[in-house]
């Protein structure tokens, strides 16, 4: 994303992340209708923060994303559907796109968490490959797309966050809320459960979408 491009809102990044996610996990529903997008954005699993947005807000955000060349409307259907132009617009490969998508949908994460949470979008061989793509995104000549955050006390890994919504604000009290090293395995198990819950939610959304057509 060029430096002159306006920074995206939370809803705009949520829409982009949802479009990329659903394209790869439930391709039969892609491109997405406004209703499907709203369901994906308001999803309770695999989302941080969880939001509650309206159809009107989705449509307004889609108009902004279309103006930025990040989304386009697809013709040929009685229901308006939308697809992303994320990888082309940002000039990133599918591996990097998967990482950015999970960061947009789930917030800051360690390389280990990203590898786990990206499994359904792209299966990375190891954490080193995740870190390599993150470092490329952080060093992009036309503007960094991710940043490595300071390591929190008790953590084994640094967290990463995307920069599509601007530079991060480091909270002074963040260190006091960091998980201990012994909690890492529990967090990974929670991530796996969340991934399974997301699959169930997507199957339900697919059935609902087909029932409306």
Curated annotation (Swiss-Prot):
Describe the family membership recorded for this protein in Swiss-Prot or TrEMBL. Answer: Belongs to the UPF0502 family.
Which HAMAP family does the annotation name?
UPF0502 (MF_01584)
Transmembrane ranges, per UniProt, are none
Q: Name one Pfam family in it.
A: DUF480
List the source organism: Dechloromonas aromatica (strain RCB)
Superkingdom in the source lineage? Bacteria
Q: What is this protein called?
A: UPF0502 protein Daro_2469
């Amino acid at each position: 994303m060029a430096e002159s491009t306006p920074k995206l809102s939370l809803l705009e990044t949520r829409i982009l992340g949802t479009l990329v996610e659903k394209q790869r996990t439930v391709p039969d529903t892609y491109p997405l209708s406004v209703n499907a997008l709203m369901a994906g954005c308001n999803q309770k699993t695999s989302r941080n923060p969880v939001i509650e947005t309206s159809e009107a807000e989705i449509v307004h955000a889609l108009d902004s994303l279309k103006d930025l060349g990040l989304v386009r409307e697809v013709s040929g259907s009685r229901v308006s559907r939308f697809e992303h132009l994320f990888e082309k617009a940002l000039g990133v490969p599918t591996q990097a796109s998967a990482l950015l998508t999970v960061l947009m949908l789930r917030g800051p994460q360690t390389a280990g968490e990203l590898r786990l949470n990206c499994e359904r979008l792209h299966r990375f061989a190891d954490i080193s490959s995740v870190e390599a793509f993150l470092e490329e995104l952080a060093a992009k000549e036309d503007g960094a797309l991710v940043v490595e955050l300071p390591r929190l006390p008790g953590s084994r890994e640094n967290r990463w966050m995307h920069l599509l919504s601007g530079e991060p604000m480091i909270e002074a009290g963040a260190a006091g809320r960091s998980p201990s090293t012994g909690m890492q395995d529990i967090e990974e198990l929670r991530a796996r459960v969340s991934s399974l819950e997301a699959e169930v939610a997507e199957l339900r959304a697919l059935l609902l979408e087909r029932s409306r057509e």
